[in-house]
Amino acid sequence: MSPETETGATSSVPRSLFDKVWDAHQVRAETAETPGLLYIDLHLVHEVTSPQAFSVLAERGLKVRRPDRTLATIDHATPTLDFAAGETPPYATAAAQNQVETLQSNTAQHGITLHGWGSGHRGVVHVIGPELGATQPGMTIVCGDSHTATHGAFGALAFGIGTTEVGHVLASQCLLQRKPKSMRVTVDGETAAGISAKDIILAIIAEIGVDGGTGCVIEYAGSAIEALDMEGRMTVCNMSIEAGARAGMIAPDETTFAWLEGREQVPTGSEWDAAIDRWRALRSDAGARFDHEVMIDAASIRPMVTWGTAPDTGIAVNAPIPQPRSPSHRKALAYMGLEAGMPVAGTQVDQVFIGSCTNSRITDLREAAAIMSGRRVADGIRALVVPGSVAVRAQAEAEGLDRIFTDAGAEWRQPGCSMCIAMNGDRGEPGQLVVSTSNRNFEGRQGPGVRTVLASPATAAAAAIAGHVIDPAELMEPAHA
């Protein structure tokens, strides 16, 4: 029996969702002198942050302790261009090819399941974990990737780790950790029509700042969060790190259970019934204490875009850019080529990217397709649509979404991280402005000198059609053929 089965244990002291999962996984409690020892239920691995960790195991003659609780895929360095069966994938660099082939070798040596070329579940690691049902409520989940918090949408405690820690988990299935503080962000009320999960999380980060959640695990709560589907909840939790948080979590509910039921790695029969009973206890108790509380009115949220080079520079698409409050804000405005007092709406666009672990799931693609249907990408604009996994791509094609995108003039790509991190050959050119559904708008994130505006799939798709940043509500009505 793994520790995640014990999260429903009763306690006389009101506990938060985070407390319950943390307590159930402590192998050894922390002291003033030493961190606690935390058991890890699921270790996700990809090609970029794992090679050095496997090398350390080889140097020390160690084996992977729990290959059955380790799941690998290739995503960061993989090309998204089509290629024929039997051909070598068109890697951008020899280093990228070496990373993929090294992971293939390491996983084969240690008996780890790898969703590589030819797998029906290859894709972005934070898409395929939930898709397979490997991500489940009450688990502890780690990955050598900043956006591991995505899996917190299922009531799991999920966070990114460094390469050294990747080695620790491979060798021991445990991590030395001090317990973070807790924060609850409550988004109550009803959002306006067309407001997406991406708009909600950009509004949250704009409210609390890029360091507002530092040292904390955030629990997202409130009626607007509960109203989100699972893909939307994953989008919210995905960007917790952009607020400085260690992780983000949402209590599991009937929406969660319905989404998980029948997936490849979830329990079945009586074991499923028992799991549901356990998972229902994964809620913060009445009276549970949080170190910080933030309240946000859902009705106040508008379609959001960023104007600067940090994720907390989100504003409503038609709102004026605020006056700079610091040298970093002045620098950001200069880099972006924008002016305070003017809205981001109307800014000319060069490329649009719809994808990433934030927004590459089937509901994200449907949202973008609804805008693009019957329309054409503006002249001179390049639009890339990159599904999050082979399975997402197949479902989108079954629904005809790929034809909507290609008929509009967008490029329909193979799955991968793609332009989010721009290490696979998908990137912008110096000086170009990219409207992106990814999670980071740092200088050069999508290529040297590239300027990034973060947005929802609907807002990104609308920018591709209009040729400039625009409120997607202006294109919500179906186009006439």
UniProtKB/Swiss-Prot annotation:
Q: What is its EC number?
A: 4.2.1.33
Binding locations of [4Fe-4S] cluster: C357, C417, C420
Keyword annotations: 4Fe-4S, Amino-acid biosynthesis, Branched-chain amino acid biosynthesis, Iron, Iron-sulfur, Leucine biosynthesis, Lyase, Metal-binding
Q: Which Gene3D superfamilies match?
A: Aconitase, domain 3
Required cofactor(s): [4Fe-4S] cluster
Task: Indicate the enzyme's highest-level EC class.
Answer: lyase
* Molecular function in Gene Ontology: 3-isopropylmalate dehydratase activity; 4 iron, 4 sulfur cluster binding; metal ion binding
Q: What InterPro entries does this protein map onto?
A: 3-IsopropMal_deHydase_lsu, Acnase/IPM_dHydase_lsu_aba_1/3, Acoase/IPM_deHydtase_lsu_aba, Aconitase_4Fe-4S_BS, Aconitase_4Fe-4S_dom, IPM_dehydratase_rel_enz, IPMI_cat
- Tree of life domain: Bacteria
Assembly with partners or alone: Heterodimer of LeuC and LeuD.
Describe the task this protein carries out. Answer: Catalyzes the isomerization between 2-isopropylmalate and 3-isopropylmalate, via the formation of 2-isopropylmaleate.
Give the record's family classification.
Answer: Belongs to the aconitase/IPM isomerase family. LeuC type 1 subfamily.
Q: What is this protein called?
A: 3-isopropylmalate dehydratase large subunit
- The record lists the organism as Maricaulis maris (strain MCS10)
